[in-house]
């Protein structure tokens, strides 16, 4: 029967599933994300202290949103699993030990943000739980005041209870701005709210009573008011009336209405407007409706009030025109002296008006230019947005494999690949040299960004291919490619004169092969390394002559020929080559002319010459030589010493021999003992030889620490991978990283898709990672030793989970015996 999960209080809501998908340790991480989205306190913080931080969801959010080099410290009663770039402490925030540990960790630093998401163990009673949480918040505030920098933030969780208001009052005394909020991720049925305190005042001294719960949460007794206090002693002054205004009815004239600076305010205070001027009363704009509206303004609506304002505007224009006419008539009647003064004042007025007009025109021009510039900037922004939108759509199409990068449906007839053979004549050559750079720029800008990485990937594949091949295989591949290039050059020399319309000025005919080889040889031998090659050739001749003389003397001293070495196909081939080369050497001894240089210029290496000489040594001895008469003293050539790889005991013994001559003499003297085994191993049985080596060996006076030191060095050397293995692992890692990047891009495209459901997204993501081979995990196999009397079918043993394999103890013994047999056979060889 299936086990029923905990679904009370809608525990598994969307934030629960989001925390599972995004990797947060708790759903409360989204509370901090939403608080930071509103108040923006994590982006500018350089140091953060998280109290009651387990299991570490808020620490994960802080590490994500804060700068990389920030200091993040988390404290809780229970241990917190390690997080990158986060320091965790297991302490009680109500104790002095926690304060000392924080001082040790922070040193002289002051934190910018203090977080507190702590809550006590609940379940006793609501009143007790609320008080415990308020007391815990007060202790967190006490720690925050010790380590918070000036202007820092303090974010804490508080339960809504009767202790909430005292806490809020204490926060307001210590911080500049205090706001209470409830993020969307907090459950509606929960009594928790979050208080964000910003702008820490950092007072020089804080009263200890603030952090004493007995004083902070003390109930204040409200004294009851007496009846005499409730009775008002003096009647308050009436409000809403202007001082000195004894009546509410105000009658005004039309002249006052026309002179009013604020006509709307004038109409709100007036009750009636009397038309006392005859000219204004006879004006065409003064209709019967206007007269009726002027009699009682308090009852007018918006439409009638607007008609009164329009009537006022017409009357003001009429009065202004009339005043101008009167001013002109008055100017005519002025005397000549007054006329001069008037002209000067008029000129000044005209000049001032012209300056005012110029200023207005300049301001208008500046406004027009600013508007045009703003329109141009808006147009550029619109074009840029459009271009970015098209590029994003193209990238999404490529990521979703709806379109291939670099493939266009348009015709590619004229925009094919460039070829020299298409240029025929001087005119086409000039067109190519001039070029169309604008077209090239537009072509490059139209290309998608994904095409940029194609050439790099191809180069990486070529380099990885060269690193995979051995030197011999690489040389063979290069030789094969050179032969192909030579064949292609030979075919390119064939000239089809009938099909060509003109001569291509860029195609140059190739020279003959012999001429090219001679030029390459002359360039090669003109290097500085071949400057003293003549002297080297003379020395080589002298050495070869000395070797021949020494061989002939050894041949005379030996009565019988040595047995011929075992020959195979390679040795026979080399011996035949050596027989052909012997006469050339004798000719080189007698004649040191141009042939000497030719023989020294051969491409064969010195190691091959030495091998050939060793193979043909038996045949040269049988021929004999007349070189004894020359009287050369030949020094015998010693065979190269074969170095033996020492085990840790041998290395320790060598260190003792190299460090002390006395120890060396003692070791040599002690080697002559009764355990010395001087018999020939071939004449004795193998089992006897092995037992003697195992049991009749005298222990060497070696230091165990020294032997262990060399054994450890050997283990370190053996643990290092060889170059080919390291390169193969690096190539495999590079391929996996490349595949992972491609899969991530596809996964982002799937996640950003809106048309499919979450279940379909998860299925597509699983298929993507399965195709990329990133979700494969090696299956763990548990080996279980079978007991006697157990049949073929074995039940799952107790305590074993997952895949298990039953093995036999007999199998272990057989494998041990096989290893011994292989070791024995290896010794025989």
Curated annotation (Swiss-Prot):
Subcellular location field: Nucleus, Nucleolus
Compositionally biased residues, Acidic residues: 336-346, 354-363, 456-473
Record-listed cross-link Glycyl lysine isopeptide (Lys-Gly) (interchain with G-Cter in SUMO2), residues: 570, 626, 642, 661, 693
Keywords noted in UniProt: Citrullination, Coiled coil, Isopeptide bond, Methyltransferase, Nucleus, Phosphoprotein, Ribosome biogenesis, rRNA processing, S-adenosyl-L-methionine, Transferase, Ubl conjugation
Region Disordered, residue ranges: 332-367, 443-508, 528-634, 794-829
Binding site for S-adenosyl-L-methionine: 56, 58, 76, 92, 117
Modified residue annotations for Phosphoserine: 333, 335-336, 345, 353, 531, 544, 575, 659, 671
Positions with biased composition (Basic residues): 794-804
Modified residues (Citrulline): 389, 766
Biased composition (Basic and acidic residues): 805-820
Major localization class: nucleus
EC number: 2.1.1.-
Active site: 157
GO biological-process terms attached to the record: maturation of 5.8S rRNA from tricistronic rRNA transcript (SSU-rRNA, 5.8S rRNA, LSU-rRNA); maturation of LSU-rRNA from tricistronic rRNA transcript (SSU-rRNA, 5.8S rRNA, LSU-rRNA); RNA methylation; rRNA methylation
PTM entry text: Citrullinated by PADI4.
GO molecular-function terms, A-Z: RNA 2'-O-methyltransferase activity; rRNA (guanine) methyltransferase activity; rRNA (uridine-2'-O-)-methyltransferase activity
Coiled coil: 722-760
Reactions the enzyme catalyzes: a ribonucleotide in rRNA + S-adenosyl-L-methionine = a 2'-O-methylribonucleotide in rRNA + S-adenosyl-L-homocysteine + H(+)
SUPFAM superfamilies cross-referenced by the UniProt entry: S-adenosyl-L-methionine-dependent methyltransferases
Family: Belongs to the class I-like SAM-binding methyltransferase superfamily. RNA methyltransferase RlmE family. SPB1 subfamily.
Function: RNA 2'-O-methyltransferase involved in the processing of the 34S pre-rRNA to 18S rRNA and in 40S ribosomal subunit formation.
Complex formation: Interacts with NIP7.
Name of the protein in question: pre-rRNA 2'-O-ribose RNA methyltransferase FTSJ3
Lineage: Eukaryota, Metazoa, Chordata, Craniata, Vertebrata
């Amino acid at each position: 029967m299936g086990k029923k999960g905990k679904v009370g209080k809608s525990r598994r809501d969307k934030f629960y599933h989001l925390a599972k998908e995004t990797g947060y340790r708790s759903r409360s991480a989204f509370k901090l994300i939403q608080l930071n989205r509103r108040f923006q306190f994590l982006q500018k913080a350089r140091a953060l202290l998280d109290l009651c931080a387990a299991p570490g969801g808020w620490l994960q959010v802080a590490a994500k949103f804060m700068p990389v080099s920030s200091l993040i410290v988390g404290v809780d009663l229970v241990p917190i699993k390690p997080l990158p770039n986060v320091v965790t402490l297991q302490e009680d925030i109500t104790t002095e030990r926690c304060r000392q540990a924080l001082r040790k960790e922070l040193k002289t630093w002051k934190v910018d943000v203090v977080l507190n998401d702590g809550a006590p163990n609940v379940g006793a009673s609501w009143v007790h739980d609320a008080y415990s949480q308020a007391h815990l918040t007060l202790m967190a505030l006490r720690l925050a005041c010790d380590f918070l920098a000036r202007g820092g933030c303090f974010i804490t969780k508080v339960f809504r209870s009767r202790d909430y208001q005292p806490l809020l009052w204490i926060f307001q005394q210590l911080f500049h701005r205090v706001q209470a909020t409830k993020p969307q991720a907090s459950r509606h049925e929960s009594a928790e709210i979050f208080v964000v305190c910003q702008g820490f005042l950092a007072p020089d001294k804080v009263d200890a009573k603030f952090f004493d719960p007995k004083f902070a949460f003390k109930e204040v007794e409200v004294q009851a008011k007496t009846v005499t206090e409730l009775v008002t002693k003096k009647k308050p002054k009436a409000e809403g009336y202007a001082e000195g205004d004894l009546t509410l009815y105000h009658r005004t004239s039309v002249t006052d209405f026309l002179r009013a600076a604020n006509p709307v305010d004038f109409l709100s205070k007036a009750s009636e407007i009397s038309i006392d001027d005859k000219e204004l009363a006879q004006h065409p704009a003064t209709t019967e409706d206007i007269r009726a509206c002027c009699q009682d303004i308090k009852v007018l609506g918006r439409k009638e009030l607007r008609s009164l304002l329009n009537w006022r505007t017409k009357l003001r224009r009429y009065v202004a025109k009339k005043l101008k006419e009167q001013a002109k008539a008055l100017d005519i009647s002025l005397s000549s002296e007054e006329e001069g003064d008037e002209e000067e004042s008029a000129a000044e007025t005209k000049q001032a008006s012209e300056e005012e007009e110029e200023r207005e025109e300049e301001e208008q021009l500046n406004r027009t230019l600013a508007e045009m510039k703003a329109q141009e900037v808006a147009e550029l922004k619109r074009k840029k947005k459009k271009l970015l939108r098209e590029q994003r759509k193209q990238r999404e199409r490529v990521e979703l494999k709806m379109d291939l990068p670099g493939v266009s449906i348009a015709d590619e007839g004229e925009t094919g690949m460039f070829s020299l053979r298409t240029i025929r004549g001087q005119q086409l050559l000039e067109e190519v040299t001039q070029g169309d750079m604008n077209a090239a720029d537009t072509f490059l800008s139209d290309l998608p960004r994904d095409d940029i990485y194609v050439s790099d990937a191809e180069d990486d594949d070529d380099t990885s291919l060269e690193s995979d091949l051995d030197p011999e295989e690489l040389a063979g591949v290069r030789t094969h490619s050179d032969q192909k290039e030579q064949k292609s050059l030979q075919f390119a020399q064939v000239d089809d004169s009938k099909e060509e319309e003109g001569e291509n000025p860029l195609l140059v005919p190739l020279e003959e092969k012999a001429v090219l080889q001679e030029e390459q040889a002359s360039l090669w031998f003109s290097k500085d390394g071949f400057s003293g090659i003549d002297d080297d050739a003379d020395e080589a001749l002298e050495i070869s002559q000395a070797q021949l003389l020494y061989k002939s003397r050894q041949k005379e001293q030996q009565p019988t020929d040595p047995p011929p070495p075992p020959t195979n196909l390679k040795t026979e081939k080399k011996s035949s080559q050596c027989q052909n080369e012997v006469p050339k050497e004798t000719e080189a001894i007698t004649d040191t002319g141009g042939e000497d240089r030719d023989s020294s210029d051969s491409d064969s290496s010195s190691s091959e010459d030495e091998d050939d000489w060793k193979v043909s040594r038996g045949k040269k001895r049988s021929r004999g030589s007349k070189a004894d008469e020359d009287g050369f003293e030949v020094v015998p050539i010693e065979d190269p010493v074969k170095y033996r790889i020492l085990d840790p005991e041998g290395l320790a013994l060598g260190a003792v021999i190299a460090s002390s001559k006395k120890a060396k003499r003692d070791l040599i003297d002690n080697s002559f003992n009764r355990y010395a085994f001087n018999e020939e191993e071939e004449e004795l049985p193998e089992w006897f030889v092995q037992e003697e080596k195992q049991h009749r060996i005298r222990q060497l006076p070696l230091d165990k620490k020294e032997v262990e030191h060399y054994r450890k060095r050997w283990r370190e050397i053996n643990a290092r991978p060889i170059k080919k293995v390291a390169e193969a692992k690096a190539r495999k890692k590079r391929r996996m990283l490349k595949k992972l990047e491609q899969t991530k891009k596809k996964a982002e495209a799937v996640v950003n898709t809106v048309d499919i459901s979450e279940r379909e997204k998860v299925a597509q993501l699983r298929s993507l990672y399965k195709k990329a081979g990133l979700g494969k995990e090696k299956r763990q196999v548990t080996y279980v030793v079978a007991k006697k009397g157990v049949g073929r079918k074995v039940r799952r043993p107790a305590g074993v989970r997952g895949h298990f394999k039953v093995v036999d103890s007999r199998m272990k013994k057989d494998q041990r015996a096989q290893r011994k047999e292989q070791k024995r056979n290896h010794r025989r060889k």
